[in-house]
């Protein structure tokens, strides 16, 4: 079926972007997973989504951070087109059982207001982020108009502020809801280094504080 073919392609593309995203956040992802071609995805997961081959739940990802293997994160692909509070509770139950506090939820069409509220209520014990499938069809950081973003460590931020004798409040800002900030999972108070090509200087670097 043409619908199955299109849906399989979408699921492969979305999962690929998610793997790139968690890899760019410093989580461990095997290179063959990052490079997985569509045909290999079909062999591994199936090519008939209409028959639950794959079911979205088959695509669940669990990754550990490069710097701290205890820092693990789930990526869930719920079956429900619109996510309600029941799904959020089931996700938190699974996180609790495995002692994992971070997760990304990939939603098909959206979330109910009560589900969104419950995500806010569960922070900071459970840090849940959500992305629409449509947002993950392309990797925003690969767009030619998006400059390179490098997330600074707390030490690098302190060094930057000391070097230029600045306070946080004096840095230019980037909103936490900015698409690139969301891609990197940035939190308020973090600083990102933005590197743009420059005809005169080779490259032009700016710093932004997440607010």
Curated annotation (Swiss-Prot):
Molecular function via GO: DNA binding; DNA-directed RNA polymerase activity
A biological-process GO annotation: transcription by RNA polymerase II
GO terms under cellular component: RNA polymerase I complex; RNA polymerase II, core complex; RNA polymerase III complex
PROSITE patterns for the chain: RNA_POL_H_23KD
Subunit text: Component of the RNA polymerase I (Pol I), RNA polymerase II (Pol II) and RNA polymerase III (Pol III) complexes consisting of at least 13, 12 and 17 subunits, respectively. In RNA Pol II, this subunit is present in 2-fold molar excess over the other subunits.
Stated role: DNA-dependent RNA polymerase catalyzes the transcription of DNA into RNA using the four ribonucleoside triphosphates as substrates. Common component of RNA polymerases I, II and III which synthesize ribosomal RNA precursors, mRNA precursors and many functional non-coding RNAs, and small RNAs, such as 5S rRNA and tRNAs, respectively. Pol II is the central component of the basal RNA polymerase II transcription machinery. Pols are composed of mobile elements that move relative to each other.
UniProt record similarity statement: Belongs to the archaeal Rpo5/eukaryotic RPB5 RNA polymerase subunit family.
Name of the featured protein: DNA-directed RNA polymerases I, II, and III subunit RPABC1
Organism: Caenorhabditis elegans
Species lineage: Eukaryota, Metazoa, Ecdysozoa, Nematoda, Chromadorea
Gene coding for it: rpb-5
